Regions:
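Hydrophobic/anchoring residues in structured secondary elements
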Residues: 155, 286-288, 323
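ABC transporter nucleotide-binding domains
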Residues: 27-31, 36-221, 225-234, 239-240
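Conserved short beta-strand edge segments in small beta-sheet-based binding/regulatory domains
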Residues: 316-324
Length: 360
């Protein structure tokens, strides 16, 4: 039992070998004190500053109406900042918007593919739009079809595809010109879990090839799995920033929960007193639960060993155990007080953005 527990508590974080950028990295995205105020006086973005290094995968989280959509539309040149500056790949979004657009891929919440066309036809149109040299188009199309695993259906109309397949095709269309930076705005909203997981794999492939990815998402486990770093937005301001692990460390420690077979109050009191008396657990918190006990400790593996020694000495039979670690949901709740996941922007925010787009 103890060996199984140690295996459970030693599982790696959702994304291992995170490469947090250093000051030596060149910046792919440089936003400095960005404000965006709408015509009605509403300030949707209030002093956002972001440094995103080349090759980084950044997650951008926030509750409804926090300003996520407004921020990303400003970064991709669909809105001008009212105050502050934004540089993408070294180009200023206000004075050099066309250069910015040519150097990025932008996947909006709404699918941009033509469902009446095939993947191959959609990609060919995208190549023409982005000015991919004609002698390179066929090779790029085949490479992208392989990347998103649509080669076998490359000549079937996209309207026959599942939502996940359409998202994968949409992903491919924003990559035809090989942009060094890709912006993904709620890319997996509405997909079932299996489809989301497959799309995640393709995003990881894109990032592993050196592409910088800026992701807004309503799925916190998505950010945990994919992102090197996360920024949390509320009321148009960034209120927290860091790696998923560092943010989770701020809200608590791991919890070991043990259920006894046929527990009695007397038995639980006796065991809890014995566990609290263990010197190696002086930094742990031990509490009674309806079925047994719960132990919160900085080192849950060490705590588990001590707890199981006490239970063995007390001849207490165990029916189940579990280890819970802090999640980004816990971080999000502690920061925003919102018990819902970071969700899609409000209709008001999207409507305002649509009426104040930068002229192309």
């Amino acid at each position: 039992m103890t060996g199984n527990l140690q295996m459970a508590v030693q599982q790696s974080s959702p994304r291992t070998n995170r490469t947090v950028p250093t000051q030596e990295n060149d910046l792919a995205i440089d936003a400095d004190n960005v404000h965006v105020t709408y015509d009605d006086g509403t300030e949707a973005v209030r002093g956002v500053s972001l440094d995103v290094a080349e090759g980084e995968f950044l997650g951008f989280l926030g509750p409804n109406g926090a300003g996520k959509t407004t921020t990303i539309r400003t970064l991709v040149t669909l809105l001008y900042p009212t105050e502050g500056s934004v540089s993408i790949n070294g180009y200023d979004t206000t004075t050099e918007p066309q250069a910015v657009r040519e150097s990025i891929g932008y996947m909006a919440q709404e699918t941009s593919i033509d469902l009446e066309l095939t993947p191959r036809e959609n990609l060919r149109i995208a190549c023409e739009m982005y000015g991919v040299p004609s002698d390179e188009r066929d090779e790029r199309i085949e490479t992208l079809l392989d990347l998103v695993d649509l080669h076998d259906v490359a000549d079937k109309r996209a309207e026959t595809f599942s939502g996940g397949m359409q998202k994968r095709l949409d992903t491919a269309t924003v990559l035809v010109h090989r942009p060094p930076v890709v912006f993904l705005d709620e890319p997996t909203t509405g997909l079932d879990p299996e489809a989301r997981f497959r799309v995640w794999d393709y995003f990881e492939k894109i990032n592993s090839r050196g592409t910088t990815v800026f992701l807004t998402t309503q799925y916190l486990e998505e950010a945990d799995r994919l992102c090197d770093r996360v920024a949390v937005l509320e009321d148009g301001q960034i209120i927290a920033e860091g790696t998923p692990e560092s943010l989770k460390d701020t809200v608590g420690t791991d919890t070991l929960t043990v259920a006894f077979e046929q527990p009695t109050d007397r038995q639980k009191r006796r065991v809890i007193e014995a566990v609290r008396a263990v010197q190696t657990l002086d930094d742990a918190t031990v509490e009674s639960t309806p079925s047994g006990l719960a132990v919160k400790a900085p080192d849950v593996t060490r705590a588990a060993t001590s707890v199981f020694e006490v239970l063995t000495d007390a001849d207490v039979a165990i029916s189940a155990f579990d280890v819970d670690s802090p999640t980004l949901d816990d971080v999000f709740l502690s920061l925003t007080g919102d018990d819902e996941s970071a969700a899609v922007e409000s209709e008001i925010d999207s409507t305002r953005a649509a009426t104040q787009e930068v002229p192309r």
